[in-house]
Amino acid sequence: MLKIIAKIFGSKHEKDIKKIQPIVDRINEIYGTLNALPDEAFRNKGVELRKKVRDKLIPFETKIKETEHKLERPDMSHEEHEKLNIELEQLRNKYEEATAAILDEVLPETFALVKETCRRLKGHTYTVMGHEMVWDMVPYDVQLIGGIVLHQGKIAEMATGEGKTLVSTLPVFLNALTGRGVHVVTVNEYLAQRDMEWMRPVYEYHGLSTGVILAGLYSNQRRNAYLCDITWGTNSEFGFDYLRDNMAGSEEEMVQRDFYFAIVDEVDSVLIDEARTPLIISGPVPNSDTDTKYREIKPWIEQLVRAQQNLVATLLDQAEKTLKEKPNDFDAGLALLRVKRGQPKNKRFIKMLSQPGIGKLVQSVENEYLKDNSSRMHEVDDELFYAVDEKANTIDLTEKGREFLGKLSHQDQDLFLLPDVGSEIAAIEADKNLQPTDKIRKKDEVYRLYSERSDSLHTIGQLLKAYTLFAKDDEYVVQNGQVMIVDEFTGRVLAGRRYSDGLHQAIEAKENVKIEGETQTMATITIQNYFRLYSKLAGMTGTAETEASEFFEIYKLDVVVIPTNHPIARHDQDDLVYKTRREKYNAIVNKVQELNAKGQPVLVGTASVEVSETLSRMLRAKRIQHNVLNAKQHAREAEIVAMAGQKGAVTIATNMAGRGTDIKLGPGVREMGGLFILGSERHESRRIDRQLRGRAGRQGDPGESIFYVSLEDDLMRLFGSDRVIAVMDKLGHEEGDVIEHSMITKSIERAQKKVEEQNFAIRKRLLEYDDVMNQQREVIYTRRRKALKMGRLKNDIMDLLQDYCYTVAKKFHESNDPAGLEEQVLRELSVEFHVEASAFEREPFEQTAEALYKAASEFYHRKENSLPDEIMQQIEKYAVLSVIDQKWREHLREIDSLREGINLRAYGQKDPLLEYKQEAYKLFVELLREIEHETLSVAFRLFPVSQDESEEIEARQRRQAVRQERLVAQHAEAESTYKIAADGGMNATLWMPGDEIVVQQPVRTEKKPGRNDDCPCGSGKKYKNCCGANE
């Protein structure tokens, strides 16, 4: 029905192109007039366009700066502040509207200018990544259409070989005229550097500056790159710079400008494939004993896994024996279902599933236990030591498994019993027979026991995942004594990336390599929320249409399919389906041998290192020369890809040969039918399959593509084989037989769609959780940036003081404790405040608060008069920044802990997301209270020290510098890791050229409390966890 409607009214993409066509006609009209202009007059055109755009925007920028400056006035009332904030927001909106209007106005002339520039550069030679390249590109009409789509803030889907890199020059040049900076985001640093060097002549011809962000650059180099009109870099480099800017100790250390316009190359890879893994800057966990912990528990897990394997073997024996006598026996089906739940990748089990009727039997038994919301599934799992859910990527330890591990640990079931901390602490407090010291000791024991057991349970869970869900040469490889993650979408080794939450350490223990130390989160943001910072976002890729709904729902990005310059001549064949992998591999090798005999180049796409090496061994046995491109051979990637289109070439590649590469056909290959693409299995994402097909048939070249599939492939086994198995059973297929039908291909695509929907749900859920943190992050980072950019922060300090005075006065009035009030004010503010006990009882707390505010204000005023204004400014900034950084780190740790356990609330019929929002809000309110309290305390107690004490301060700063360098930037699951540059990142130590800063402690007249004593402030916490935390 939809196809009939599209034929009558035209498709969405046809309508999109129809709207753009008049602009393309106008561009070409102007382009025809530029040819006759001499070089100088032509260059002046670019200068004139830039001046026209800037003249329109400068008045808005001036007004915005004036308003921002007014907001910094220390004597402003709250009402004036709110009014100016609204005015500023309106100004910024008008600024964005004016920017869009002027750029739309000059678009035809600018695009024509870029096109003519490309024509004038033809024949010129440039060095790109060390190679000489002759410029031979002038944008076609379809490329002009792509450029317009990108400028409009949409995603342009363009087929392989259609020149996406050249297309980007058009909107990049146009938007760079604003002077606000344009970011071009690539999937790796090689492409960032290459594209910058390749396209730079177009920009430099008209005086636009270019820069690139690479790992390892120092802060000043990064800042200079961001100050350029156009900046290239990877999504992780841009994201980490944003996080580091919000950890900076001074405004001079920040490197980024405002977020105006970003064009994301391979947008589906960046915004979808990478979106499940948040960017994290982390630091080492002090006193972490990771190695011992994992080494100690590893033997238990190995014994548990062996016990499960033996159990599975027994179940398979029972099922095989029973099925010989009773082909459709329910108990045999139940045994096989237990095998599926206990060891789903068992080769013997997978082979059994290809036998007639077996798959159907297992499915029918599983459906029986899945009735009533899976209420009976525990009956299946209870016989196992643990249950594996491959689809959800989770493992559930059963009661039988817990008993097994309990005996190995000599703790029986106690290992899995976490003490109820709240009730046990309350019981200790209520026990009148215990002395205060005994209470402290018993409380410590409860906390220690809880910490040890929860830590052990976490380690057990991660080791079990490492042994059952993560396979060497599939999810990761081991190289040079290190566990290296393999990107499932590109097949590339992700150098330096690490799995989070202790999983990487568990895999390191499994593979007997060095176990790296654990880390804690210092700053984090998801890819989705980072790119939402930009005023305008656009992207380009060869494969976006299948994810159009996700792009719109998450990023509000429309997808427009750009027509090709030449019709696609590639022939895409229906899939060939075999029963077993062995049959499929034999068929692939035979097909490669057939193609190689006539000289037609063939690219064999695989989903893992293991499969590529298996096929390579089989081809070697047939004496067929070939190249292998996988995570272990990536160093020769450019050389191998360059040769893949030559006559007689045979290339086996994981998904690596997909992005940023063009395979050009050698002499005589077109006549043979072009490049032949042979997929060894379907990927779980249709986009990756389309990327592989797209290697052939570029720019109208001939080509062919086909996928070979078996029922043992993970995708078919998990999501799509039921109908296909039924068809094969009915047709009575024998070994070696193959099914080829469009119905089968459609069935496989439906299976892929299921996986895509599941992955979308995961990414969407991640975003819903991170939206909570995003709101909190914005509040904290806004406070931090304000503190960095403003001069004196006295007004803010005085506001905090007023709140503090009323809070403590009310608290101690309620308990009628004037001595407690005096002691707390002395300890927290270093202010001596005295109040008569009789007057304290008579007066309302407001009067005490006013007296306290007056005394504290006078103390602060005396401090101001005794110190230069510059030093007071640094004291106030240090108070705000150091407290925000410390408390925000602690808050992130608490949020991590909350996230880890929040899903358990579902067992209590509660929505984990709703519970998470409520709990996170409570934690955030407490965080803000603590930040305000601590900031005030530090601002009052911070004083310059004498020269005699400066050596100790310098030593502390050196220790901090060492800790600072140990911070790393990484994805939660996997992203680039490298040391922070020495002159970048957080500067939590206040540096003064002449003086040093230290917190002045009040003079004590009573005995100092011990580390484990109750804190004298009355908080109920131990001294070491409260006022003594920094000692």
From Swiss-Prot:
It comes from the Bacteria. Its cofactor is Zn(2+). It is an enzyme of class 7 (translocase). It is a peripheral membrane protein. Disulfide bonds: none annotated. Its EC number is 7.4.2.8. May bind 1 zinc ion per subunit. It catalyses: ATP + H2O + cellular proteinSide 1 = ADP + phosphate + cellular proteinSide 2. This is Protein translocase subunit SecA. The gene is secA.
